[in-house]
């Protein structure tokens, strides 16, 4: 053993048992269970564990009954005064009573973070868990689990900062109770939840000073979102473009709109309405549906110009999904309205431009490739990334556009999927060589 190792061992031996046990109690319980045979001195420290993370309990091919037995033993023999964290991921069928008992134990021992994932059962756990007495809980994440919160709780959930609900029935009364009781709430996630009633989600957080982040994802029966949150900084929406977003969000800095196309309703107007509150954001992630709605459009037989100017936008990422008529022209017209843009990412992993694009060739190509008037000069742009690059001729149009119109360009990365070689096009060597004479920093990677 080296001299340095000897010194470390001597230092450890000088520590009191109480101090070492306190330090070890903060380790995940599965780690202390696995290593308890290595030291007789600390073989029982798992009984004091504060971090009861059982998320990977099936990773060693245990059966459901074996996993439940291990968790039950931990709770029966737990001697610590507090439990900081409890993470559980299993099929709740047949063990609901045990789960309720475990959660009750956590609540009695001042739990701070509680994560319950019952998605493996494919059935929502209908037995409601009562959090009304919790005065310490700061993080609550429930998947496939019924959630109830009475209004005007005297104590419970006052310190809650993060709430994430998945596959839970949501009512506006519940949302009101959340914001009435959880006065320190910073982040709310609603994923694959069922919106009851009229399909209108109303979030009134006008008096909240700490509410910073909202995620609304995959709620198919949602018709409208009315959001009044002056302190909100990050808003993420994933769903049909038909859903109307009415937003009062003065502090918004980051927005994501992962739109899916609705077959029943033309979505341009609802997309435009949603963007009214987002033109001042610094970072924007979206799909080509946004471009279709806010770049040049024909309205009543007349060609309308873009509706928005994104004066503060610095980061822009767009996912292309078929079908779409969008081309480099639509991208360029959008970017022209972003004078401070520094980073641009386009993801075309699941998209391929058409072999022939006559409208582009006839109406837009000459306009975009004409650099004499500098209509598309991107002075601040430094980073460009194309994810899913396959060497298509129009992808090279996009690459050429950026090397010609971004004088401050530092990095241009083309990410080619390793498993998409069959979709890759024959390289246009001459054109690639021309592009590299303009900007030598083009980097092709495989991911």
Swiss-Prot record:
Stretches assigned to the F-box domain: 10-57
Pfam families found in the cross-reference section: F-box, LRR_At1g61320_AtMIF1
Domain FBD: 384-416
InterPro entries with a match to the protein in the record: At1g61320/At1g61330-like, F-box-like_dom_sf, F-box_dom, LRR_At1g61320_AtMIF1, LRR_dom_sf
Name of the protein: Putative FBD-associated F-box protein At1g61330
Organism (species): Arabidopsis thaliana
